[in-house]
Swiss-Prot record:
Organism: Desulfovibrio desulfuricans (strain ATCC 27774 / DSM 6949 / MB)
Example GO BP: UMP salvage
Gene Ontology molecular-function annotations: GTP binding; magnesium ion binding; uracil phosphoribosyltransferase activity
Similarity section: Belongs to the UPRTase family.
Cofactor binding note of this UniProt entry: Binds 1 Mg(2+) ion per subunit. The magnesium is bound as Mg-PRPP.
Binding site for uracil: I193, G198, D199, A200
Enzyme class: transferase
Annotated EC: 2.4.2.9
Coiled-coil regions listed in the entry: none
Keywords, ordered alphabetically: Allosteric enzyme, Glycosyltransferase, GTP-binding, Magnesium, Nucleotide-binding, Transferase
Pfam families reported for this sequence: UPRTase
Cofactor list: Mg(2+)
Matches recorded under HAMAP family: Upp_B
Protein name as annotated: Uracil phosphoribosyltransferase
């Protein structure tokens, strides 16, 4: 398993905006998608391309097009929806799969309540979207669900990760790579990332 921290001035600046308590719901939502665009840029660096000759404005021209890669974007409801538009801006042809999980606030374990996956999961790269990788429970549950449906190419996009969550995912699924904007210090007793962003789902959707 590889963990890629996308260390770029724009990413650091935008994560700083997301950390601010004063950031409005609309700004939090838009900046989350901006960071998602930067993360997906890094996550797709390994895509292969093929050369084609097409008709350009001044005659035939050789171009490169992505080849041999079927993608499904997998937002974990509900917070993962806050990254989806940014990713789809860059990969508009991706299919959307949806996994609904919520965290039991007493046990901190994920509870599954909805699943709708794209077809041919065994042929697709699944890009899981979840703003916060905290305990790792939701991500591990989603990875296991995808693997049960035949998916073998999986990576995760997260705005912020906790070291504890990364360690759990690595132990359970060492074949899954993680792309993140930041690795924070630790989890508190309630399972929230410190310093973190707060509850990303509430901040994206304007709820408490």
């Amino acid at each position: 398993m590889a963990v890629y921290v996308v260390d770029h001035p724009l990413v650091r600046h935008k994560i700083g905006i997301l950390r601010m308590e004063s950031t409005s719901t609309s700004e939090f939502r838009s900046v989350s998608n901006e960071v998602a665009r930067l993360l997906i840029y890094e996550a797709t660096k390994g895509f292969r391309t093929e050369k084609h000759t097409v008709q350009g404005w001044a005659g035939p021209v050789e171009i490169e097009a992505i080849s041999g890669k079927k993608v499904t974007v997998v937002p974990i409801l509900r917070a993962g929806l806050g990254l989806m538009d940014g990713v789809l801006d860059m990969i508009p042809g991706a299919k959307i799969s949806v996994v609904g999980l919520y965290r039991n606030e007493e046990t901190l374990e994920p509870v599954e309540y909805y699943v709708k996956l794209a077809s041919d999961m065994d042929q697709r790269l699944a890009i899981i979207l979840d703003p916060m990788l905290a305990t790792g429970g939701s991500l591990i549950a989603t990875i296991e669900l995808l693997k049960r449906h035949g998916c073998r190419q999986i990576c995760s996009l997260n705005l912020v990760c906790a070291p504890e969550g990364i360690a759990k995912v690595e132990a359970a699924h060492p074949d899954v790579d993680i792309y993140t904007a930041a690795i924070d210090d630790h989890l508190n007793e309630q399972g929230y990332i410190i310093p973190g962003l707060g509850d990303a789902g509430d901040r994206i959707f304007g709820t408490k």
